[in-house]
Amino acid sequence: MRTKQEYLIRYKDGSLYCELANIWIDPIKPVKRALITHAHFDHFTFGCEEYISTRETAILLKKRVGDNIKIKTFDYGQEFKINGINISFHPSGHILGSSQIRFIFAEEKWLITGDFKLQKDETCKQYEIVKTDYLISECTFG
């Protein structure tokens, strides 16, 4: 089964992009709307009009970017909708507030892992296995 577009999420200008929602994932340049997997500097950029993340990531982002940023927060597992796409954050076990991001559209599930860690860590929520049809995985070390 294919989505209404050939690919719901694609690589564009150095970042992941969902055209249907007009949203970037961990962008490397300022954009209108950015989903952020976690608050490490290689996963967000300064100057986005709006950030969307977990509550914990938002706290860390404000420390790094400044309190004046526009940011929407969601709990793990809490679905929100943008242009008919259901989006939710799920624990990735990497750092405090880190998340995988799931997109559901046209009965297909897409998952972006962001950085993740399978080993238990007392400083963050443990990695959650999320059912998906398409997996886009972070690959820092090759």
How would you label these PLM feature ranges?
Residues 38:
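Conserved G/P- and acidic residue-centered "switch" motifs that form tight phosphate/ATP-binding loops
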